[in-house]
């Protein structure tokens, strides 16, 4: 496989700055880099789009090495990605965000996956979190922006320190907000590369893989939860509803701020 750094030197683009870390004061971002070379996000995204899920994961492991991090949500797509990655390299870095509001079944899934793969997850939790759950349940925050920002987004920023590319399990079929998700691209939220290896997979393909490879998965999926987050803001979705209809049900919110 030809290294990305050999063929994708990037011309300047108005969305990015040419020199220096961080913003240049005009809202522009630093130019994306792989292996010390500035690269063209659109070109590299198009090339990785042509890869299959396992090939894309193998490419990312080879390209980013120890600067690659796999974010694990303990949902069905995480089970698939973990199995693929572990078969390629048993030493890849798996981490998760512990909001301390996850379902008991989610923590149990974490433990079963750790045993299945013989690994330890790196856990990230908000330092000294305020008592947010009671305020959320009391309806003080509307759609829960502050809770997600505190327990998820801020914690994710810490988790990504030292990471050049992170791996997510989002798919285009999840919701309208994810319909155009690339398999690989520059994540402007965190100023890092992001790989979505299962971007083009549907539920049937995910479940066939899990069953064929006998990978542990979250039992809440068998109880009407197509998407699983924190207990206070996750409910089952009715048949035929959007896969994320059970997240922040009754509100216009569909994302926590990490993926959208």
Name each model-derived stretch.
Residues 2-260:
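Nucleotide-activated chemistry modules centered on ATP-dependent adenylation/adenylyltransferase
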């Amino acid at each position: 496989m030809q290294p990305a750094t050999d063929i994708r030197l990037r011309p300047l683009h108005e969305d990015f700055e040419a020199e220096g870390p961080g913003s240049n004061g005009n809202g522009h971002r630093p130019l994306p880099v792989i292996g010390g070379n500035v690269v063209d996000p659109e070109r590299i995204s198009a090339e990785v789009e042509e890869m299959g899920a396992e090939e894309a994961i193998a490419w990312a492991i080879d390209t980013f090495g120890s600067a690659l991090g796999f974010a694990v949500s303990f949902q069905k797509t995480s089970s698939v990605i973990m199995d693929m990655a572990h078969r390629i390299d048993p030493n890849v870095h798996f981490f998760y965000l512990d909001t301390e509001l996850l379902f008991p079944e989610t923590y149990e899934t974490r433990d079963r996956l750790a045993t299945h793969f013989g690994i330890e997850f790196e856990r990230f939790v908000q330092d000294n979190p305020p008592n947010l759950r009671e305020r959320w349940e009391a309806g003080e925050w509307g759609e829960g922006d502050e809770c997600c920002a505190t327990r998820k987004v801020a914690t994710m920023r810490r988790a990504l320190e030292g990471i050049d590319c992170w791996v997510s399990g989002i798919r285009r079929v999840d919701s309208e907000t994810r319909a155009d998700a690339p398999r690989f691209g520059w994540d402007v939220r965190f100023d890092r590369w992001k790989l979505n290896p299962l971007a083009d997979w549907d539920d049937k393909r995910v479940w066939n893989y899990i069953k064929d490879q006998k990978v542990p998965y979250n039992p809440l999926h068998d109880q009407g939860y197509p998407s699983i987050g924190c207990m206070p803001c996750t409910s089952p979705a009715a048949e035929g509803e959007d896969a994320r209809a059970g997240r922040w049900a009754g509100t216009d919110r569909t994302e926590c701020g990490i993926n959208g």
